[in-house]
Amino acid sequence: MPQTPPFSAMFDSSGYNRNLYQSAEDSCGGLYYHDNNLLSGSLEALIQHLVPNVDYYPDRTYIFTFLLSSRLFMHPYELMAKVCHLCVEHQRLSDPDSDKNQMRKIAPKILQLLTEWTETFPYDFRDERMMRNLKDLAHRIASGEEQTYRKNVQQMMQCLIRKLAALSQYEEVLAKISSTSTDRLTVLKTKPQSIQRDIITVCNDPYTLAQQLTHIELERLNYIGPEEFVQAFVQKDPLDNDKSCYSERKKTRNLEAYVEWFNRLSYLVATEICMPVKKKHRARMIEYFIDVARECFNIGNFNSLMAIISGMNMSPVSRLKKTWAKVKTAKFDILEHQMDPSSNFYNYRTALRGAAQRSLTAHSSREKIVIPFFSLLIKDIYFLNEGCANRLPNGHVNFEKFWELAKQVSEFMTWKQVECPFERDRKILQYLLTVPVFSEDALYLASYESEGPENHIEKDRWKSLRSSLLGRV
């Protein structure tokens, strides 16, 4: 079965250099290079550049970049149809009398292209039209005399089906978790005193909690497809008069679920701090989360770290001055400094580069962990997308932009494939994922109940919240 190399080896500081690989420029035309780097091309020429022939196979960096960015201009099923057509027509796979020797040369290359597509962008094949075209082309390859092709085609299809089945199962679990926490949220809003447990009774060790948070982060990262970063920003293609790509719906559900997890963790932290009646218990909870956040930093789990800091900086928590007076904040100040947004998160980006470098030379799974602050990664990709046009004035696809986009996404692809080395604790994971959390209003109410309002505005809000949430005046 054809194997693909790791993502970390795909991109260097420049784009795809045609001197390193055989180029199809002469045969398809319409591609523009500068200093041997592909900068732009017509969409049709770029599609032809994707399709292998007897003497040519596209560089894997080009395959990833084009499959990632092409969805800004056309649906994946439309691209697959064109690829199939080119494979069949150009390589005469539809002709039973075609040269068998040529077939032996081209079949493994087409199979390799299909394998790379199904391995890297498996979610494209949830579309029946994609799967139909894939099966048709795979059948043409497998119907040859070489038994190896049949075996490899079968392995490719089985691997794809396993991935799609795992995705469906994951989505079912997410839906179940979401419904569980939502059902109980109503009870929590109206009767906050009914909640007995807190996070420390479930897990009194901050290091263990940081490890369990890392489990959740890596699992959710793993299910985000690279295409979701592009599909989140899909807009109407100016050369497409009829429709925008993905007009049916933006297929970004796993990316959105991950962002929702960040928000949930922030609210969970704030809830756990605001819930205790006694000041010393609230102070203890703050110090507990500071230790959890510090361990997240040490692990390389920057997303959980930022979610915890965000929760502790929410107004209902930060206003608890008497509680904070009992807290040793030196460690928290250091963590806040690391995640300081000034100078475009310079300190965080420096720490992220350090973690990424550690990951490259890692001797253990733990050292490989890099979980970026996800909202900032999305923001970086958004500004890259907004800052450069998809097409040049001559109608060419601006491929220089997409090299940079693919470089950012491919780094993420490397990080998301790391296996979590820590032992799973189902009880702790269940609590983190399903325990009810306060809404913003409920957080303010709990905060005012703990440390009374300090001015008339807070007093009026407190009365309003007591009336709306508790039915009291």
Swiss-Prot record:
Q: Which UniProt keywords apply?
A: Endosome, Guanine-nucleotide releasing factor
What InterPro entries does the record point to?
Ras-like_GEF, Ras-like_Gua-exchang_fac_N, Ras_G-nucl-exch_fac_CS, Ras_GEF_dom_sf, RASGEF_cat_dom, RASGEF_cat_dom_sf
What species is this protein from? Homo sapiens (Human)
Q: What is this protein called?
A: Ras-GEF domain-containing family member 1B
Compartment(s): Early endosome; Late endosome; Midbody
Fetch the PANTHER family from UniProt: GUANINE NUCLEOTIDE EXCHANGE FACTOR, RAS-GEF DOMAIN-CONTAINING FAMILY MEMBER 1B
Q: Which residues form the N-terminal Ras-GEF domain?
A: 34-164
Assembly behavior: Interacts with Ras family proteins. Interacts with CCDC124 during cytokinesis.
- Domain Ras-GEF: start-end pairs: 204-452
| Conditions for induction | Up-regulated in macrophages stimulated with IFNG, GPI-mucins or bacterial lipopolysaccharides (LPS).
What gene makes this protein? Answer: RASGEF1B
Pfam families, per database record: RasGEF, RasGEF_N
Q: Name one GO biological process term.
A: Ras protein signal transduction
Instruction: Give a short account of what the protein does.
Output: Guanine nucleotide exchange factor (GEF) with specificity for RAP2A, it doesn't seems to activate other Ras family proteins (in vitro).
Taxonomic lineage of this organism?
Eukaryota, Metazoa, Chordata, Craniata, Vertebrata
This protein's GO cellular component annotations are: early endosome; late endosome; midbody; plasma membrane
Q: Name one GO molecular function term.
A: guanyl-nucleotide exchange factor activity
Going by the entry's taxonomy, the superkingdom of the source organism is recorded as Eukaryota
